[in-house]
Amino acid sequence: MSVNLINIGFGNIVAGNRVIAVVSPESAPIKRIIQEARERGMLIDATYGRRTRAVIITDSDHVILSAIQPETVSHRLSGEDGNR
């Protein structure tokens, strides 16, 4: 079983086969998911202090914040972008 590694910005990499969803952080339900993950200790902030542009939800219930656009993460997951 090969692991598909995806660059989510600033040298941070996630296992693509563990990603369930890549969403925008603006909606109230996503903000609630982020807050609940923070309270459970399951939030990973990979923004390096920059604005959160994508929220990545994994099958292990981890929530990862990224400073790159959801569309960019999606392209990298689908293999259309060589920036892995």
Swiss-Prot record:
Protein name: Putative regulatory protein Hore_09800
Pfam families registered for this protein in UniProt: RemA-like (PF04025)
HAMAP family (UniProt xref): RemA (MF_01503)
TM ranges: none
Family: Belongs to the RemA family.
NCBIfam families to which the protein is assigned, alphabetical: MtxBflmRegRemA, PRK04323.1
